[in-house]
Amino acid sequence: MIRNSMKSHTELLSWNLLQKEADRVRLNSDSLTCVVPDSNNYESSKQINCIEYDYSRQRVNRTIIDLLIDLANEVKLQEKIDNLINGKKINISENRPALHTALRDLGNKSIMIDGLDIMSAVINTREKIKVISNQIREKKWLGHSGLPITDIVNIGIGGSDLGPRVCINALSNYISKEFNYHFISDVDPASFNDVIAKINPQTTLFIVSSKSFTTKETLLNARKAFALYEDTASIDQHFIAVTAHPERAYQMGIKTVLPIWDWVGGRFSFCSAVNLITAIAIGYEQFVELLAGAHDIDTHVQFTDFKNNIPVLMALIGIWNNNFLNIHYDLIGYNFKEYFVPYVQQLDMESNGKSIDVNGRMVDYATGPIVWGGLGNQAQHSYFQLLCQGTHRCVGDFITLKTNDEHEINSMCHYKMKVLSEGIQTIENPYGYIPGNMPMNHLILSDCSPYTLGALVALYEHKIFEQSVIWNINPFDQPGIESAKSAHREITLSSES
C-alpha cells in the first residue's frame, strides 16, 4: 500500500464545514422543514431540454449547496471534467484516457491521444454502423442461404449486454417490429437454449461484443452459436464482432468486425458499436438522436456553472447523503420499462465501489453506495414497506415520464414520494407511524425517446464520474473484477493439468 503525506479529503476545509452542517441537521432530524430555514430564493429544481431535476425533497439548503460547491472547487472538479472530455489520461492505473464522450461528439473538433486525432476512427465506425443497420433494415443483408435477417442476437456480458438491453426495452415504441431481438449473456445452458429455440439460424445475425475478445462467457456462447452452422464459410453473413482486438475475432472466423478502443470502458460503451443492435432496431437516424442527447449532457456538464449543473448537483447531493448523513443505500425507482436499474448498478458500483484512492491509499470515508431498485409500481408490493418503516435509511431517485402525467402510474409515484418524504403520524394507530424524511430526487423526463434516453444515461455517467473526483478514486478500472477473472483462469488451468 502506497502511503504519502498528501491530505485526505476529510481534511479539506469545506469537508469539515459540511460535517458541522450535518451535525446540525441530525439535531433537527424530525422534520425536513428544520433543514431548510434559509429557503428564501432557494431554487430546488433545474431543467435541461428533456430532463427536469427536482431536489426539493432532499435534506439540503442553500448553505449546504454552497458548501458542496466549495468542496467541488477545492478538489478542482471543473479541471477534472475538462480533462475527461478533452482526452487527458485520467484513468491513471491503466495510463489512458476515458473518452466515451468522444463517441457521441457530433461536431468537427479534433480530440488527440498520443498525437493522433481519434475522431476520424470514431466517424468511420459510425459510418459502418449506418451502412450495416441500413442494409439489414432494407433486407439487403442476406444470410448464407440468401434469406434476409429476421432475428438479431446480442452476445455479450456487462456493458456489452446491459446498455443494448436498456435501449431495446425502453425504446419499444421506436424499434422496428420486423425483427426479433434477443440477448445471451449467461453461461447457464438454459439461457442459450431458450434463445436458440426461438430463431432460425439461416435468418439470424449474431453480434458478439467483447472489448478484449477473451471474455470467457461471451466466447463460450459465441462458439455454441458457431456450431449452429455447417462450416466456417456459412457464418460470414451471420456474425459481427465488436472488439478492441479485431485480430482475435478474425482468428475465430468472424470477418465483419467493428472497433471499440481501449480508451472506452465497457460500462461506458453505451454510445459505441457495442450498441449496434439498437441502431438496427430504431434506425441510424434515431441512433444519432440517442448520441445527440448524450452529447448535449456532455456540453451541459462542461460549460454550466455548478449551481445550475444537473449532474454536478446530483453528484454533490449524493456525496452529502452518503458521506455526511451516512445513508449508503441508493434506490432508483422508475415508471418506464425494465433494465435501467441493473444498468446503473453496474455503472455506479463497478466504477465507484473502491476503497483505494488514486494515490494508492486506503480511504477513510465512504465511497460508492449500494444501488438497487426497480419498477415503481412493483415497489408497492415488494420493498415499499421497508422504505416506509424499515431500519435501513435510503435515498431515492424517482424517475417519471411527463407523458404519463394523466396516468395512474404517475399519481402512484407522487403518492409514494409524499409518504416517504412527509411521513404519516396517526395517534389512533401507532403501528401505522411512518417517520418520513427520506431524501429523494425526482427526475421528470419529457418522453422516452432516443434523445431523452441518451441524455439520461449520460447524466448518470457524469454524476458517477464527478463523485469519483470528490472521493479521489479511479472510476475507470475494475481490479476486483480482474482479480476474479485471474483466479478463475488459475483454477481452470489447475483442473486441466
Swiss-Prot record:
Signal peptide: none annotated. Pfam families: PGI. Its EC number is 5.3.1.9. GO terms for molecular function: carbohydrate derivative binding; glucose-6-phosphate isomerase activity; monosaccharide binding. PROSITE patterns: P_GLUCOSE_ISOMERASE_1, P_GLUCOSE_ISOMERASE_2, P_GLUCOSE_ISOMERASE_3. Pathway: Carbohydrate biosynthesis; gluconeogenesis; Carbohydrate degradation; glycolysis; D-glyceraldehyde 3-phosphate and glycerone phosphate from D-glucose: step 2/4. GO terms for biological process: gluconeogenesis; glucose 6-phosphate metabolic process; glycolytic process. The active site is at E350, H381, K485. One of its GO terms (cellular component) is cytosol. CDD domains: SIS_PGI_1, SIS_PGI_2. The keyword Hydrolase does not apply. It catalyses: alpha-D-glucose 6-phosphate = beta-D-fructose 6-phosphate. It is found in: Cytoplasm. SUPFAM superfamilies: SIS domain. Keywords: Cytoplasm, Gluconeogenesis, Glycolysis, Isomerase. Catalyzes the reversible isomerization of glucose-6-phosphate to fructose-6-phosphate. PANTHER family: GLUCOSE-6-PHOSPHATE ISOMERASE. Belongs to the GPI family. This is Glucose-6-phosphate isomerase. It comes from Legionella pneumophila. The lineage of its organism: Bacteria, Pseudomonadati, Pseudomonadota, Gammaproteobacteria, Legionellales.
